[in-house]
Amino acid sequence: MTVPGNVPDGTSPDGGPGAPWLHTSANHIRTADGSVWHGRGANLSDTRSCNACTYATASYPGEVMRRADELIDVWKANFIRLDLESYASATVGSPTARAHWQGVLDDAAYLAELKSIVDHIGAKGAYVLVSLWADPTFSQRSDVSEVGWPTAQTNAVLAELAATFASDPHVLLGVCNEPQGNFDGALDARAWAAMDSAVAAIRSVEDAAGVPHHIVAVQGTGGWARRLDYYVTHPIAAGGGANVAYEVHVYNRAADFPSLFVNAAQTLPVIIGEFGLANMTEGDVQVLQRRAEQLEIPHLAWTFHMRCPPNLLVDNSAGGCGVGMELQPTAWGQLLKNRLAIPW
């Protein structure tokens, strides 16, 4: 029979040891030879660049690739979360019209740019979490605290991404960004159902294409992706539950780490999708990095940008898009760069 995460004949998803397909086993993400995968790096904005480049007439995939080169070759990251950004209209939340705002279902050139960026990252031997970050299909039902969840419309976007990257072993897929509210867990079951449906949409595309199941990251059920506890007793069921990772965003003091990721990581494969100097001190960040490495949890800093705080880069853009600017680390960036220089 077909084993979830493997190729249709049930054999190893990659053809042999050392090949690049990832899979989950127990509470870890592993490489083809069974070794625990040690992925770490940072978030990287797509061509929209945290709204910094949406107004420019041209689009700049080459700039995203240049920053990926810096992050991988110089800072020594081997894992990048590529944050996809789209809006409901050219003017939503903006005093002037954006030139670039449509999502992958409506802007073929944007999707092609994303493919070229992801191919570029993969050619360098790094993995990329292709993640919906700002997307108009996310639920916005603040009246019932369903904000930031994936919807049926989101699932259509995820299906397109799954088809686009179906044969790319270096790609992981992120369902959404940050489910908000639900601090008391009262909506956990409904949030879980939305996530499970999203994973099912991706698996349907993969199975139809006859390709291995990619790692899919589902986000914490509330508190801006901070709550993983429901998944401990209710792991995702779609696709047999295999090759699903559980993504948490951490901007808290070290005392909160057990409830945020340490406890969940005892039984679940966890990804820390964001962390950084916001409410955290440098000491808190260093504790997180040490604990993540000890527990073999992939982790991604926020963010390799100059105006999307907490910023890893100094703003040398003169307030613009930043094409060709010097990629100079901030103090936060230097802290991350120093840690990435230490082998894990």
Where are these regions (language model features)?
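A mature extracytoplasmic/lumenal domain signature
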Residues: 43, 84-86, 132-134, 177, ...
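Localized chelating/binding microdomains
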Residues: 35, 40, 54, 67, ...
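Short active-site-proximal "capping" loops at secondary-structure junctions
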Residues: 47-49, 85-89, 215, 223-224
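N-terminal carbohydrate-binding accessory modules
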Residues: 7-79, 92-100, 335, 339-344
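Extracellular glycoside hydrolase catalytic/binding regions
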Residues: 21, 53-56, 60-61, 142-172, ...
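Aromatic-lined substrate-binding rim segments of carbohydrate-active enzymes
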Residues: 58-137, 151-156, 164, 196-210, ...
